[in-house]
Amino acid sequence: MDSNTVSSFQVDCFLWHVRKQIVDQELGDAPFLDRLRRDQKSLRGRGSTLGLDIEAATHVGKQIVEKILKEESDEALTMTMASTPASRYITDMTTEELSRDWFMLMPKQKVEGPLCIRIDQAIMNKNIMLKANFSVIFDRLETLILLRAFTEEGAIVGEISPLPSFPGHTIEDVKNAIGVLIGGLEWNDNTVRVSKTLQRFAWGSSNENGGPPLTPKQKRKMARTTRSKVRRDKMAD
């Protein structure tokens, strides 16, 4: 096992513990709390994958951080903070939309790289809007927190979320997953639009009809998803 992978996990565990103390003292806002909950799931998955105990890793992570802070000068810290751009948290969804439980009449789940796509195949002939909460850096999507598909009535009919056991994803991973989700929804004659905020930070542009400017590769992925469903339906008949 790579030592950097282990030390990164240990430091992440300790930093999560510090952030938890901030929340316990009621000093964190809603986005801070949301990231804390999702990072907890991610750490549990990573710990299981690496075979490491989170409590023990937290103690080692504390030692690593204390050693770095002891050697770090205030001047170096100021220079680092000044040269590192800060990420922003973008919220398409309200706290209620983000935390609401939902269920599927005809569930389908697909793993696309480090992301999990869930869709209710019972939904037909609906106008659907994709909205997401995510972080942004350099005016580009950095990390997807959660994406959900909503009908005009407000029902949740689809979702894209990071896999807790597979930390890290790229903007291309997110766009590919969105392409698969759109393909699955459009197969049932639904009309799918993407929020302007998500279009702007994922694709760098917005489309008036709400459709994302998918690349040829993403369109081929949508087509493959649709064709595989056609074959399964024929076999079922």
UniProtKB/Swiss-Prot annotation:
SUPFAM superfamilies from the UniProt entry: Ns1 effector domain-like (SSF143021), S15/NS1 RNA-binding domain (SSF47060)
Keyword Ubl conjugation among UniProt keywords: yes
Gene Ontology terms: cellular component: host cell cytoplasm; host cell nucleus
InterPro entries in alphabetical order: NS1, NS1A, NS1A_effect_dom-like_sf, uS15_NS1_RNA-bd_sf
Record flagged with keyword Cytoplasm: no
Location of the region described as PABPN1-binding in the Swiss-Prot/TrEMBL record: 223-230
Chain ranges for the short sequence motif Nuclear export signal as given in the UniProt record: 137-146
Motif (Nuclear localization signal): 34-38
Composition skew (Basic residues), residue ranges: 217-237
Protein modification: Upon interferon induction, ISGylated via host HERC5; this results in the impairment of NS1 interaction with RNA targets due to its inability to form homodimers and to interact with host EIF2AK2/PKR.
Entry's family note: Belongs to the influenza A viruses NS1 family.
Protein name: Non-structural protein 1
Source organism of this protein record: Influenza A virus (strain A/Swine/Colorado/1/1977 H3N2)
